[in-house]
Amino acid sequence: MSSSRSPHRSSTDSASKGALHGASHGDSPSPSKNRRRLWAGVTGLSIACVVALGWWAGTPLDNPGTATPDQQVGDGEAEDAGQSTLWQQYQRVWQANQTRPPEARKPLPLPDVSRAGYHQGEALPALELEPRDAGEASDKGSAAKGTAGESEKGALRRFDVTAYGADGSDTLSDRRAILKAHAAMRDWQRQGSDDADRPARRGVLYFPAGDYVVYGAAERDWFYSRLVALKAAVADAERQQALREALLKMQGLSLAGSHWTLMGAGSDVTHLKQTRPMLPLHASWYWSTPWLLHLGNLAEGGKQEEWQAVTPTSHRQPADTQDAITLADEADEADETDGAALAPGDEVLLESIDKRPEAVARALAPYQMEKDASTGESRWLIERDGVIKRARYRVVARDGKRLTLSLPVVHERFPGEQWRIARLHPAREVGVQGITLNGNWRGHFKHHRSAEDDSGFGLLDLDGITDGWVRDVRLDSFNQGVKVRHSSQLTLEDVTMTGKPGHIAMTISDSNQVLARQVVDQSHAWHAPGVARYATHNVYLELEHAGDSGIELHGQQSRDNVFDRKRGGHVRDRWGASVGHQPNHLRGLVLWNPVNTGKPHAAWHFMRADSHFGKVIMPTVVGATGHALGIANRHDYVRVMNAKGVTEYDPLPPMDALQARVESPGEAVKPASLYRAQRELLQETRE
């Protein structure tokens, strides 16, 4: 721990200064008293130094094979008062890397999330729409022609759902009117798509103040009656299940397309409602209920083209340091003649799957794979599936086989890894703002009791989107609030969750560079906002959730995600993930200046020895304040696992080796926000 932030610093400094001060004034004490005071001051300083050295000696470092002096907390250089040691190390390495050739760049001690958010963190667009005339909504006859309920300013046009039959003042279904308005908007966009010299037309699906029923009793009864008829008409169980899934997927509203916004008059006055729970795709798949609103590219994350091989690296390439890759010689030779070669402007997915034992061991270090004591079989699927690294980028330049990407490759690359790249077709410029989505969850939530408990009221699914946003949105009375998946470069801000406790508040899954700021979960959801499944380089900035809940860390190889200035609790069994999908999070989880508003913990376990669940690989906890958040040691976990026959650690780690990299416990550090500081550093460098 830095001595400038030590809780013992002020007392030891005052003791030594007091002794010296007393000796320099008239009315001075006797020489023997001076010696005793000086000795007390020196002794106090010595104790403080020993405590500080002991703490840092017990602080786990990165893998022995990959650590550098720049990664070690407290390397002896002078610090600014209150400045995080890790932040100072990050600054030094990051700045030095700007002048080094790519092959000589050093690993950063923290993930670089400076480019998270809409257009890499830029301000969200301001939609300037002309006010709707009072008579427009009643002009239903011309609505079918695509004029009423629309206001146009340049390439921006508003499609008012009330002009297509929606009525926010009654309790009848508005589903058909919403679909008609969306179809009219899409037709208008397509009419302007042939002009390559004009920007894409931007549509706004507009909901004036009112309550609009998207899924209610009429929809529930209709789908249920069709499901009963399906069961009676189709005897084959496999075919029956396939038809059931196709039917029930239509329960929610799937609204495709790019360059459009679903917009209300404000979250305090515009409400889209789901008054009945939807039916799950399979009775025993509790997670499978469709979402009320499904926006994006509806081809499950966006249409993906064929994979192309990437030339392997000959040396270790640290994460966040190099923005170029080279296609293999055979990668797209066939595409050169048919115009399908990757080109600037293309959205791409870059992926590696490495099943080599050394890759799995490296991903889990300093821990070992947990195995069944009786069979010796691995508990975690990472050994079977391999280490999976995947993220989304945009190609910004091409020179022969060399592609320059929109941001540095977010994963570390090692010799022997096989990388590949594919063009994607995500939805772009999709926004949701100024609305409340109301579910009708009124039960007493029990985890994994039923499909209704887990997913009966799922409100907003953002799937396969690049450069999108959500702002001024409230989610009320839900089982699942928001899910961002297969996406990149999104900003979610001013999002509030309310109502009775449900299952999951917000999930960022299989996505990168997503920024969620000023998200407030007042619903006491079982899983507070968090990450899952390959998520990387995402940021929760100033997240607030209840003290009786905990963030979601739903496993499947998430890595390098940042919770910046989070306020909320730490509760056992709230991370999520099955046994096979452990660990809950690989390396790179950062809690920066978190405030514990829940129960105090003398020794919080990031690696639980008393359960198959609850495994996080060496997170970083900096500036934790609020109620106590002590960190358990690795020694006790390893000792118990060995005793159970689950692992074979030899030797055991020392008693003071913690389950996290810890800095400044009990005192917040500077910078107050890691994300904002990284953005400032990035901007300074660009200038």
Question: Regions from the language model: what does each represent?
Answer:
Residues 1-21:
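Short, intrinsically disordered terminal tails adjacent to the first/last structured region
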Residues 2-5, 36-42, 47-448, 622-687:
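Extracellular "leader-to-stem" segments immediately downstream of a signal peptide or signal-anchor
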Residues 3-4, 29-31:
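Compositionally biased low-complexity segments, especially N-terminal hydrophobic helices
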Residues 162, 259, 268, 428-439, ...:
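Right-handed parallel beta-helix
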Residues 251-256, 269-297, 335, 422-425, ...:
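Glycine-rich beta-solenoid repeat tracts in large extracellular/virion proteins
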Residues 449-455:
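Extracytoplasmic beta-rich repeat domains
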Residues 539-687:
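Gly/Ser/Thr/Ala-enriched C-terminal appendages of enzymes
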